[in-house]
A protein has these predicted regions:
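Alpha/beta-hydrolase superfamily serine-hydrolase fold, recognizing
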Residues: 1-251
């Protein structure tokens, strides 16, 4: 059974609508990672925590950890570990995977990364930021305020944490990354910079697939009322989960 490490602070609606369905369908053991939060703990604290969780899985796989997790030790396939995160957690997928590519994970194999609606942005507003409608899950004010609280003090949105395809970041072709599935919502405010990341990954000859959900916005699947009441939101949530499951099964 694949092991999926969820790099996000999962709120109730996400747990209800997404995580159990993913675990059942993959099938997979989903490990929810506890992350220190900003502004008390600015980045790279959450990246450090995500990487520490991966090292904990490696220790379990090697049998050299003091604690014992029956589900993981007895049923987890450490040869198929995936990183998944949504929104800001999707940024962590990229950075934790990049850091993991610099160390020996054996017997763990990082089989893939799944950034869902990543918070990749630039200081200059993109066309989609200026033209797409805001949603309850993401407004321009939220983008600005959240990143001001999360980034290292004095840093702009061009920082590698939020712009891994920018000139300040390590060249993507220099990174040892597993296969990626980038999930994008068509009406997401930050769709254009997410697509810029996809294009940069392809240009760097990285193994990256793209899944676009039409007619929905940032983190649409977290709205349980919409998932239950709106046919398109429900259908797109199913399509998103099925795409993620297909990617996991393929790798």
């Amino acid at each position: 059974m694949a092991v999926v490490s969820a790099l996000a602070e999962l709120i109730g609606t996400c747990i209800i609508t997404s995580t159990p369905r993913l675990a059942r369908s993959a099938p997979a053991i989903v490990v929810s990672v506890y992350l220190r939060l900003a502004p008390e703990h600015r980045l790279p604290a959450a990246i450090d925590d995500g990487f520490s969780a991966l090292m904990w899985l490696r220790a379990l796989a090697r049998g050299d950890h003091d604690s014992y997790e029956p589900w993981l030790s007895n049923y987890g396939d450490f040869n198929r570990v995936f990183l998944i995160g949504d929104s800001s957690g999707a940024n962590l997928v990229h950075h934790v995977a990049a850091r993991a590519g610099q160390v020996d994970l054996s017997p763990v194999r990082l089989a893939g990364g799944i950034p869902v609606h990543p918070g990749f942005v630039r200081s200059e507003r993109s066309k989609s930021e200026m033209e797409q409608p805001e949603s309850p899950f993401l407004t321009l004010d939220m983008v600005d305020r959240f990143l001001k609280l999360a980034l290292p003090k004095g840093c702009s949105k061009d920082h590698p944490f939020t712009c891994p395809m920018g000139p300040a970041a390590p060249p993507l072709d220099s990174l040892n990354l597993p296969p990626f599935l980038l999930c994008v919502a068509e009406t997401d405010l930050i769709r254009d910079t997410e697509m810029e990341y996809y294009d940069a990954m392809k240009k760097a000859d990285k193994d990256v697939e793209l899944l676009i959900n039409p007619g929905v916005g940032h983190s649409f699947y977290l709205n349980k009322i919409a998932v239950d009441m709106d046919p398109n939101t429900a259908a797109q949530t199913t399509d998103l989960l099925e795409g993620i499951v297909e990617f996991i099964k393929k790798h």
